[in-house]
């Protein structure tokens, strides 16, 4: 099945560094996603831990560790690299978050779902 480009949010809605969680609809299905902005780059992922399949955040829009160097799963503290979603610490080490290719047009972030 081919992917569908979906509008996520405006680029300026996310601090740098920072993150934002969203629920988006594509093909009549709701999907939890989140966007991370760091050093003016944006990365989008499905909001699902590879270990438990539950959401990574326990506080809305809080996906990064205290130093904003890693994406962190609030359930068990797993740490994921921001740029590629690779788990570098925790029970799902070496697994990856599902990355969603994203683009920015007219300061609006879109992702392929």
Predicted features and spans:
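Short cysteine clusters
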Residues: 49, 73-76
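Short cysteine/histidine-rich metal-coordination sites, predominantly Zn2+-binding motifs
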Residues: 63-71, 87-95
């Amino acid at each position: 099945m081919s992917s569908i480009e979906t509008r996520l949010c405006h680029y300026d809605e996310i601090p740098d560094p920072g993150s934002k969680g969203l629920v988006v609809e594509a093909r009549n299905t709701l999907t939890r996603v989140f966007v991370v902005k760091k050093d003016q780059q944006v990365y989008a992922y499905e909001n699902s831990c590879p270990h438990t399949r539950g959401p990574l955040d326990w506080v809305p829009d809080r996906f990064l560790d205290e130093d904003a160097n890693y994406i962190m799963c609030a359930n068990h503290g797993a740490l994921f690299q921001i740029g590629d979603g690779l788990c570098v610490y925790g029970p799902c080490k070496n697994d990856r978050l599902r990355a969603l290719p994203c683009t920015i047009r007219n300061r609006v972030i879109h992702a392929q779902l």
